[in-house]
Amino acid sequence: MGIFKVEKYIGSDTPGLVYQLNNPWLVYSENTNVYKFETIAGFWNLFSTKLTNKRLSVLRDNTMTNDYQSHCYFVVIDLNNNIDSYQVFMKLLLGLIGETLSNGYLINGLTWINDSGNKRIIIWLSNTVNTVDKICFTEEYNDYIFHQNNCHNITYMSLNESKQ
């Protein structure tokens, strides 16, 4: 199956269609559908209603290259069971798409996992980041992630470590 380009199916008078994002984004859903959006309207067209997926990844369009995968690092945030993990994911995703989550292009995507007993958000880091100390979340998101009892464990690892 190919990539579903969201903007092709949005009316030309839709608010936000003229507002191009700095990067196109790909959304990978658990049922192997891939969606691409490049505008604010495309984003809201996909995320205006709560998705029922148990796994969802949103990555910059150019992220998944062989070179990137071989040097990929990510942060795994295990969320507490008593919070709405989708709400946390959406807040971080809005920050990522709006480029207010971190200083610079250090984060290439997010994955949301909401299986029973396994609420998790994975932050895909740029392959230029080789230590968690270099992640510069803006103050708003730093507080939201680390200081509001939203998570109980944070792990930093490379893609190679996760396959072992």
Curated annotation (Swiss-Prot):
InterPro entries from the UniProt entry: TIF_eIF4e-like
**Top-level lineage group:** Viruses
**Which SUPFAM superfamilies would you find in this protein's record?**
eIF4e-like (SSF55418)
UniProt protein name: Uncharacterized protein L529
Recorded source organism is Acanthamoeba polyphaga mimivirus (APMV)
